[in-house]
C-alpha cells in the first residue's frame, strides 16, 4: 500500500478505518446510477450509506437489481488513491448483513461488462484519481442529478 505524506511532507503508513455496515437500504431512498447500456441490470446507491473516511475511502451500499427482480446488496468501499474496491458485507433477505469472506482490495477495471465500480470510481467518487471528490452531500448531489464529477 502506498504511504501518505503528512503536512510536513513526511511519509506515514496508510491505515484503513474500521467499517461497520450501515442500516439496510430502504427501496424508496435508492438513487439509480447509469452504468452501461451493455447490462440489463439496474444499479442503485443508498445515499444514507455514503461516507468518506479519514482514510480516503468512500463507503456506500450498492444494490444491483436484475430484470427478473433479483437483488444483490453489498456494502463496499472504494479507495481513490490506489483505484481499488473492497466488499465489506453482503445483504441478506431478512435485512441483515453477512461479513464478506475476503477483505482483499481489488483493482478497479473500467470495462464494458461489470463496470459499476469503474463508473463509480471515475465518474462520481474519484475524478482526479487521488482523493474523494468531496463529502457525502457532494457525492449524493452528483449521483441524484446525474452529474459526473468530471464536469
Regions found by a protein language model. Give the residues of each.
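N-terminal secretory-pathway/extracellular module detecting exported/lumenal segments
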Residues: 1-151
Amino acid at each position: 500500500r502506498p504511504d501518505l505524506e503528512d503536512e510536513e511532507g513526511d511519509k506515514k503508513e496508510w491505515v484503513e478505518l474500521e467499517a461497520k455496515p450501515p442500516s439496510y437500504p430502504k427501496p424508496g431512498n435508492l438513487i439509480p446510477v447509469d452504468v452501461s447500456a451493455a447490462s440489463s441490470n439496474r444499479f442503485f446507491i443508498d445515499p444514507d450509506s455514503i461516507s468518506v473516511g479519514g482514510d480516503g475511502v468512500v463507503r456506500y451500499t450498492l444494490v444491483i437489481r436484475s430484470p427478473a427482480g433479483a437483488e444483490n446488496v453489498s456494502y463496499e468501499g472504494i479507495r481513490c488513491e490506489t483505484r481499488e474496491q473492497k466488499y465489506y458485507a453482503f445483504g441478506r433477505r431478512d435485512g441483515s448483513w453477512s461479513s464478506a469472506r475476503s477483505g482483499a482490495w481489488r483493482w478497479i477495471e473500467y470495462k464494458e461488462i461489470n463496470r459499476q465500480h469503474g463508473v463509480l470510481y471515475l465518474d462520481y467518487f474519484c475524478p482526479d484519481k487521488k482523493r474523494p471528490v468531496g463529502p457525502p452531500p457532494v457525492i449524493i448531489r452528483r449521483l441524484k442529478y446525474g452529474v459526473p464529477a468530471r464536469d
